[in-house]
Amino acid sequence: MGKNELVKIFVKNSNSDISIIEGVMGYYDGFDGKTNHASTHHVAALLKAPVILILDASKTSRSIAATALGFTKFHKNSRISGIILNKIGSKKHETLCRHALENLNIPIIGVIPKNSGNILESRHLGLIPVTDQKELQKKLNQVSKNIGDYLDFEKIIKICKNVNHLPKIKPQKFKKAKTSVAIALDSSFNFYYHDNIEALRREGARIKFFSPISDKKIPNCDCIYIGGGFPEILGKRLSQNNTMKKSIKQAAENGTSIYAECGGLMYLTKSIKYQNKKYKMIGLFDAETEMTKKMTLNYTDGRITSYCLISSPRNFHAHEFHYSKIINIPKDTKFLYDLNIGEGISSKKDGFSEYNVVASYCHLYFDSAKFASNIIKNSGT
């Protein structure tokens, strides 16, 4: 998305005294193994943000200093301002690690014991969504108590006070709402960039939410947006809601535009096979989905090769993250995306298209191009 867009997003969403950016994967892991591009370190550098590094200290003592030294010296400006030691086994273990780190001049701002418990549950794509967490407030209260016991907030606040002020951004202008966009949102589909939904609103979308699990049919709309999620977990309930599946398929056949990503793509195939059970889905595309144990996780780089709902031909960046594969694809299938980096649906090809529908494994950030504008423009009014 570029530096300017990144700064704009951060400033727009920073409405607190302290804003926390969660890193993903390893600190220096990014687009490839050659540079820091698109890594957590790269983001921190662009935002001029200090970094608190969390290190797994289990099964180590003095060697933790070698790990910390490697992270701080790997790049000439690591931006690392403090360390949290995770999975500490005992007071003696903590003392050994502290002694090892004494000469690095990096503040230790927290020590978390290994038996502190996994309070927030996870599944194959990460933390279980808020909508599926039981007794969430009780769990958050426990997390809050643990944080108070384990972290030195005075040191954290001191680090945060050294942050450079970022530029102010102009309020965004919103076009008059003229196109209704129905967004699937429930326990089966809830992986959305909030900025994508805001981008649609900015371009003139009137947003309606619906549940593919509970509602009988889609609301009256010009466009349907089905994001990622866990359709395999809710496969039985999705398959049993025949009126919803029928309404989506008929809408597509009648010209309603549909944009679907990952879980949405799976929902539009004929079936999803999960734990040796096959669940019948919408069948808009003549292919099937099968869950696997193999993780697909990539930044993607590719090209949209044909005019479609979201774009004219152009290059794009995105990401893919799933444990599924699309099978029984007809040999004459034409794909919308050619990928230079990434797996896609099949052999670096991604993007099914039928009627005014686009469905792929790629998760797009709409403001990286005019995707939201094109969706509104190419949807009926």
Please place each PLM-identified region on the residue numbering.
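Internal gly/pro-rich beta-alpha loop/helix module
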Residues: 61-172
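C-terminal and late-domain segments of enzyme folds
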Residues: 44, 149-153, 174-177, 189-199, ...
